[in-house]
Amino acid sequence: MFNKMRLKSALVEYKKRFIQTQWPDEKYKWEAVKCFQVNWDVNADDFAAMLTKALSQTGNLLASVNNFPAKMIIKFAEIAQEEVRAMFIELFDEGKDVYERVDSFKQKSNSLLERYGNGAAQHYQYENAICTYLWLRYPDKYYIYKLTEIKAVSNELESDYTFKKGAYADNIRNFFAFYNEICDELKQDEELKNMLASQITGTCYPDPELNAHILEAAKRNHITVKPVKVHSSDVFY
């Protein structure tokens, strides 16, 4: 549960600047999803080359200062192709619990680092990166996970979900439940859906149902919920 009036207030501000400000900055996320969808082939003979193409437009979603998850998982795929292929097959297996899949991917990355890291201190395959892989594969179901932003959104909307550092399983499960609730509200906003439809181009992941807008079109194009400071309050995009 959360304060729906606070969400509506945030959306009023968001819609005022979506086309001129938000979309130009965030369009690349829709393009990253389409790039992944077009190039992903779990059975590719050269899995590392395929993965490189699939992740080629993710930009800062999978690379930032001192954080290089895309580069590292591609390196592992070059060295241990079948192990990494199996990791993604398991991660994308919707018949299994999502947290168990995320945790398994992380633990297997630890093993890869120990054996093939060549002295590297990090594998960078943590909840943020792993949920991003899930989002790229299933953009109508998953979201990008950033704990500090999730906590900010939860506080701003006065939700009854709790997020605590180190509580990995509860955080992941509460995160998806919370954002799904927000999506349910956004899908009722026709103005949001129309705004998104007016901006989608051929380079973007298509959104045939136009179910929502801000949360990555609430399960379609994916733009995920993320706080932006506007008049000292968090708005979502």
Predicted regions and their residues:
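An N-terminal alpha-helical hairpin/helix-loop-helix interaction module that forms a charged
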Residues: M1-H123, P139-Y237
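Contiguous, well-ordered alpha-helical segments that form the cores/surfaces of helical PPI scaffolds
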Residues: I130-R137
